[in-house]
Structure formats: structure tokens, C-alpha cells
């Protein structure tokens, strides 16, 4: 029998969630570096450069890769020969205590994003608990643990279908990838779960993306003439066909949309073909450890020389400098799709909860806490600052969630432009076009890099909303791209179509 101390599991979980907040898995970094070298799309290559630079900065500074430090997920396998002689908590409670310590660490506080009463008050639990824990009792004397942090943007793009046994699984996946847009922050990993029951398929898809990026090994195996299993065949087929869609980094169009595709399957009922799809984003975060009774887990610290020699800096010649303090609607209307801008001056922030409260206040005729006239709003929920920071990592959140508020903001508050990540939907694009506005995108997965452009930050409204409060940021050379111009042209539509043609593997869909 192996005796595991309660404190060893708690501290190991706490250490793991801190670790993954600032260290990408090296297999992901290696694959992303190779994708950078291959990439021919200037916009996609620039986005990958920002992600790689941000990753190294986070590793050096021990600050989060992404402002969305995720909901904690743990896969734990407990050996049947393990005992917990000093335990006063359940395993769920131990894991939750580890998460609580990690997210409240004063040296690197992580953003608390978990809300209780999800269909009601949606109140923040303040410590990012409870974690979502998947248990398995297995033969053995050890405890095997995977800790992962998944952000809301990639989780929102998860898909499930109960297909008929005769349906084409590959066609279903290829139909869903464009539907997902760029909110899951490609390039990343796609996990496919096949079989079992609906909940089993989803769990398989989620578990699959915890494995190392190793599609290159599978390609080599296929090239050697070795026989592949059906899941391996599907991995290769989907990897090639998804990348042939031309979605590209951040949905801007390019050669690499996925760095790997994972497939796990399980027997299912003869009448069903359950299929699940779960993406892992540019902020891929997971680590694996085991406990054998000898103490807390020891996590290997990666070497900075393992990162590619890629350093992104603002291109002051190619990008247009914009003074937010004097910006006019006429200037916004003149921006062109794909144009690179460097923003300087003061902007406001606001995301889901702030937009909902603004809508409620306008409906009641109440005065807003801040004047949005001729202002730009940044969709962001930053991490709290530490030491000499003015704000913690502050990357963009998914713009489409604010689509239903876009016309209201443009026509009732005086707002003239917005910044987020990913594409905008038809409702928002129509409002942008009607109001001669524009939507700008910042790179998802480059939160620490973006934060370095923020020179001051203060809460100016809705302080009770925590990370969803309205801030005023003063920025210097903050990099963005015009994603939707005043005529309604979206680079998230034009870019992938252009690169799908260039890749030339499949016809452009109507």
C-alpha cells in the first residue's frame, strides 16, 4: 500500500496550475515554431510571432500566457493500492484547495472566472473553484494527475452530434471547423471523441487534447508503410483536410489551422455514432504528474533556449499610428480591411456583463458611468497587476459575444470602434456598416505582450463586476488589425477564402 498525504496532492495541484499559467508545453511550442517557419500568410505569420513572443515573455516573467486563466480541469487516476491516512477532505475538496491556492497566489494571481448559479445570479466564486474533476480508480500504487486550464473562448466552440452510423464523420468535422470561426484562437489542437454515449464522447474529446503534439511521428509511421489504426488514419486525414480549409492563425487565412488532431474512440450502441469535437487554443495549458508517497510532485522547469528565436516588435513603418485621444468617425471610416494599426492614447474596456448592464441602464433612461462619445472599447477582462505592473495580462475576449449589443453601443452611446478577438457575426457587421464604424482585432493568446503596451489603467465604472468592470487604459503602440471595415468587409471571411484557394486542396465553399 502507498500512503499519500493530503497536503502533497493539494500542493501539487496548486503548483501545477501556477506552472501552466506561464509555461506552454514544449511540444506545443516546438510545433508552433515549425508552423511559423512554414507560414506564407503575412497576417498569420505576424499573429504566430506575437504568440511565440508572448509565450517566452510569460515564461520569463512568470505571468499568465492569457488573461483568461481558465476553469480548472483535473483528470485523476487513483491506484487501488493507495491510501490517504491523514485525509480530512475528499479528493474533490483537496483539488479545489489546490486550485484556490494557485489562483490566489500573491506573486502571480490568476483571474477568477468561475461563476456559481450559472442559470441565475451568476456570481463569481472569487477563487476559481470548484474545479471540474474526472476520477478513475485503476490498479496500482500511484496517483496519476493531469491538470489543465481551459479558457471560455475555446470551450465555447466545442461541438457534439449524434450522427447516424452511415453518416460521414470527416464531413461533419470539416463542416464544423469553419462554423467555429476564430474564437478558439487557432492554431491549436482539435480533439475528436467517437462512440460511447453523448457524455462519453465529449469526455474522450477533452481527454484526447491532453496528449503531446506528435502528428509528425504519425506521418513518419504512415510513410514507413506501417499499418495504421482507424483513429490514426482519421488523425492524418483530418489534419490535412482541416489545414486545407485555410482558416489559419487567428482565422486570418494561412497554411496552419491545427498543429495536431487527436482521436479517441469507445464502443457504442449499434444505432448511434456519437461524435464530439473539443479544441485546444493558442493558450494550450496542461501538465502531468504522479504521486508515489515521496512528497509533492516536482515539475520540470523548461529552458528558455527551448523557445524559437522569434521576437515580435511593433513595425513602426508598416503600421499606421492612431491617436485615440483625437480619433474621429471620419478617420475610422477610412481604415481598410487588414490594415495594421498601432493604438496610442486612452480607450475604455467592457465585456459581457458590462454590456448587459449598459443595455439595462439605457432601457431605463439611466445615466452611464462613463461617456463613450468618440471612444474605442476593448473587449477584455484583465488579470490583476503585481509588483510594478499597471495591469496584468490583458488579451482580447471573443468579439461575437458582444454582437447583439453592437448596434446599441454605436447608435446610443457615441462609441466609434471596438477591439476584440476573432470574427464578428452578420448582426454586428451590419451595424458596423450602417454606422461607418470598424472592428479591430488583437491577437488572442498574446495577453502579456498586449499588457506591456498599457501604460496606465483605472476602473471608471461597474467596479462590482471585478474583472468585467469598465477600465480606462492609456496605451502606447498597442498592435491591432482592422478586421471589419466601415463597408462591412471582414478579413475573417476574405482571408480563409483566399488561402483555401492558394492551398488548393478542396474547392471554396459558397
Regions found by a protein language model. Name each.
Residues 317-327:
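Short, structured beta-strand/loop micro-motifs enriched in basic residues and often containing a Trp
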Residues 1-314, 411:
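Non-transmembrane, aqueous-exposed alpha-helical and coiled segments at domain scale
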Residues 209, 213-253, 349-481:
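Feature captures the catalytic cores and cofactor-binding loops of soluble hydro-lyases/lyases
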Residues 163, 205-209, 276-280, 293-295, ...:
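Short, solvent-exposed amphipathic alpha-helical segments in soluble enzyme
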Residues 341-343, 347:
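Generic structural signal for buried aliphatic residues
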Residues 330-333, 370:
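Residue "hotspots" at secondary-structure boundaries inside conserved domains
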Residues 332-335, 341:
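Short, well-ordered loop/turn sites that connect or cap secondary structure elements
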Residues 253-261, 268-269, 282, 452-510:
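C-terminal binding/interaction regions
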Amino acid at each position: 500500500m502507498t500512503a499519500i498525504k493530503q497536503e502533497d496532492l493539494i500542493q501539487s495541484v496548486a503548483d501545477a496550475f501556477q506552472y501552466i499559467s506561464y509555461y506552454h508545453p514544449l511540444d506545443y511550442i516546438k510545433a508552433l515554431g515549425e508552423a511559423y517557419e512554414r507560414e506564407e500568410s503575412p497576417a498569420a505569420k505576424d499573429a504566430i510571432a506575437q504568440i511565440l513572443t508572448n509565450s517566452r515573455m510569460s515564461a520569463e516573467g512568470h505571468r499568465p500566457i492569457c488573461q483568461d486563466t481558465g476553469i480548472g480541469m483535473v483528470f485523476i487516476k487513483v491506484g487501488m493500492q493507495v491510501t490517504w491516512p491523514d485525509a480530512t477532505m475528499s479528493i474533490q475538496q483537496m483539488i479545489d484547495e489546490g486550485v484556490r491556492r494557485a489562483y490566489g497566489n500573491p506573486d502571480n494571481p490568476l483571474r477568477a472566472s468561475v461563476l456559481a448559479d450559472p442559470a441565475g445570479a451568476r456570481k463569481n466564486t472569487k477563487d476559481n473553484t470548484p474545479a471540474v474533476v474526472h476520477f478513475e480508480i485503476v490498479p496500482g500504487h500511484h496517483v496519476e494527475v493531469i491538470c489543465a486550464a481551459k479558457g471560455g473562448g475555446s470551450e465555447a466552440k466545442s461541438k457534439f452530434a449524434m450522427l447516424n452510423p452511415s453518416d460521414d464523420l470527416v464531413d461533419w468535422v470539416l463542416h464544423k471547423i469553419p462554423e467555429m470561426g476564430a474564437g478558439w484562437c487557432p492554431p491549436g489542437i482539435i480533439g475528436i471523441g467517437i462512440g460511447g454515449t453523448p457524455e462519453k464522447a465529449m469526455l474522450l474529446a477533452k481527454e484526447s487534447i491532453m496528449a503531446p503534439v506528435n502528428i509528425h511521428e504519425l506521418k513518419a509511421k504512415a510513410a514507413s508503410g506501417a499499418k495504421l489504426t482507424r483513429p490514426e488514419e482519421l488523425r492524418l486525414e483530418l489534419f490535412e483536410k482541416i489545414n486545407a480549409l485555410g482558416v489559419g492563425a487567428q482565422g486570418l487565412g494561412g497554411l496552419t489551422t491545427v498543429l495536431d488532431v487527436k482521436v479517441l474512440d469507445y464502443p457504442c450502441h449499434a444505432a448511434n455514432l456519437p461524435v464530439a469535437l473539443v479544441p485546444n487554443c493558442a493558450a494550450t495549458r496542461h501538465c502531468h504528474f504522479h504521486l508515489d508517497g515521496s512528497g509533492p510532485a516536482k515539475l520540470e522547469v523548461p529552458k528558455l533556449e527551448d523557445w524559437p528565436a522569434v521576437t515580435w516588435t511593433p513595425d513602426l513603418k508598416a503600421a499606421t499610428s492612431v491617436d485615440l485621444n483625437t480619433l474621429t468617425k471620419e478617420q475610422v471610416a477610412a481604415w481598410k480591411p487588414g490594415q495594421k494599426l498601432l493604438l496610442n492614447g486612452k480607450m475604455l474596456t467592457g465585456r459581457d456583463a458590462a454590456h448587459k448592464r449598459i443595455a439595462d441602464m439605457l432601457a431605463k433612461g439611466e445615466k452611464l458611468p462613463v461617456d463613450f462619445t468618440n471612444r474605442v472599447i476593448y473587449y477584455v477582462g484583465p488579470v490583476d497587476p503585481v509588483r510594478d505592473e499597471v495591469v496584468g495580462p490583458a488579451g482580447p475576449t471573443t468579439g461575437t459575444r458582444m454582437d447583439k449589443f453592437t448596434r446599441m453601443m454605436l447608435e446610443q452611446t457615441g462609441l466609434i470602434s471596438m477591439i476584440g478577438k476573432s470574427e464578428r457575426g452578420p448582426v454586428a457587421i451590419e451595424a458596423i456598416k450602417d454606422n461607418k464604424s470598424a472592428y479591430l482585432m488583437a491577437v488572442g493568446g498574446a495577453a502579456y505582450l498586449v499588457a506591456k503596451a498599457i501604460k496606465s489603467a483605472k476602473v471608471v465604472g461597474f467596479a462590482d463586476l471585478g474583472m468585467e468592470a469598465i477600465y480606462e487604459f492609456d496605451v502606447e503602440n498597442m498592435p491591432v488589425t482592422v478586421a471589419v471595415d466601415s463597408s462591412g468587409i471582414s478579413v475573417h471571411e476574405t482571408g480563409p477564402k483566399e488561402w483555401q484557394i492558394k492551398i488548393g486542396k478542396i474547392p471554396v465553399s459558397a
